[in-house]
Amino acid sequence: MEYEDMFPYSFGLSVLRRKTAFDEMTTKQLKESANAIGLNIIPLIQTFGHFEFALKHQEFSSLREDPNWMDTICPSNERSIWLIREMISQIRHLHHDEKSIHIGCDEAYHIGLDKACQLRLNTTLNGSIDRLKLEHISRVARMAKEEFGFEQVLVWYDILTWLGQGIFPDGLFERFSQVFDNIYFAGAFKGADGISQQFVHIERYMQTLRSYQKLYHQNEKYLKDRLTGIILTGWQRYSHTTPLCELLPAGIPSLARQAISVSQWMNKKEERTDQFMQEFLNCSVRHSTSATKFVHKGFTFPFVFEFKFSDCQFPGVELYSEIEELNLLRWKAAIERYISNIETENETQNELEKMEEEFRKLRKTIASLLGHFFYEDTVDEWLAQHGHLNRFNDDDLGLPRPNRL
């Protein structure tokens, strides 16, 4: 769980908390709820990149690797190490029995720019950015293990892809198998299909998962006893300063689909995945919706598979259903706009005006449902972000491009 500014930081770190941050009691309740269904919460703390939530504050702005960017912390500033240590300490206080921690380290784009880093590069590191990165990661990992007792430290792989060939032998999984006892794959069930995407396309996310299965079989020699598991991520933003993307209720069927697929793969079982998924989500057989609902002006709705889970019974299904209705409506509106470019505009304009009223009704319903799952500031942000529900990008709908020549 990446808390970011939702963690109940205190004392010298209290400025990191947002107004609606969890308190200690809520954090403990989250842990207890997870434990009750056989899950452990592995805290994820950013220790290199994605540090905007801290570096945006004046108190810590001097720790930026580049003063013009607040995403990357300077690894050569001892106050940076103090900040990271204090964050891990407070995380450990509320996760006192957790064996693992994730120290992030993805997307640290500005490295080796601060004067302190430049000094190290020109003296002890022989100009090697790779060594600068590795020394910081290993220092933080040792801190988490030796000072705070975490047995396992996880780190994202992408920062290691930039390392020179002299650090590890050639061959990705071959070299990793010589260094790491445990390797995880990490896909996404939501939050990776567009910076402001609101509609979860299950098949697109499944393609990544299938590619991992293929990758495993191609490299089974090196991964057989080291692939420890698969992390199914569900991001809510691309970064601290970007808009909200797909909401969690909208991603539940995608999560279920991937979890079932991973379970079958890891346990080497072949089952009827779609049927199992519908049983898992407590779905009823859809009789009430005619197939004509998904056909408009000769076009067929491309996301019928996602829509059918609106009849299921899982936490958040009410919001999921309205989001899917919104997806269907904006698809029909996109078709009307497409047709208006190649036919007479009067007829299609009348259709669009009728749809405008449907968009307004949907927005009102969604606004009411959002309050059941999110804090008020998140609801306000989503509504401000989508002031008009008929303003989504149509590129993901698969419509042909009109010839306007």
Task: Place the predicted regions along the sequence by residue.
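Feature activates predominantly on carbohydrate-active enzymes
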Residues: 1-146, 155
